Amino acid sequence: MLTDNNGLQMSYSDSYNRISATKRLKDYEMLAFACKRAGKSRDEGRAYYSTGVLYDNLGKYKQAVVEYKKFLQVCRAIGDVHGEALAYNCIGVDFMKMGEQDPNNFKEAIEYHTKHKEVADVAGKFLAHINLGIIYNQMGDHEKSSINH
């Protein structure tokens, strides 16, 4: 068994997965850079999105938000409304997760889920309402929670 930074024991497979994720993070960073230089904006955005997902899987929500915001910028620049909605949702979810440690993050989560609701298709609007309901419930605002659920 190995020990991580918090003194928790990790199995060898957990350690391998973290090393593998770290390598993939570097690969996606390099891919985003290469795509940006080549003018392949859609692929650049996908690399940022994939990097955000990897950070989410590692529980590094602040870093994931940084990558999702880069993805959002690219989506706006190329007019990818579906990607923009996805980015708003991902950012909102991460702020919601960070709100469990710092309730001030719930305000950011509400902002991004509201933006998601504004640009999303019908299924996305439904998801945004569900997420807003969850946030308002966690904040103790049951009236707004019931409106969105």
Regions found by a protein language model. Name each.
Residues 1-43:
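Flexible inter-repeat linkers and adjacent short helices
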Residues 31, 48, 67, 71, ...:
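Aromatic/pi-system hotspot detector in well-structured domains
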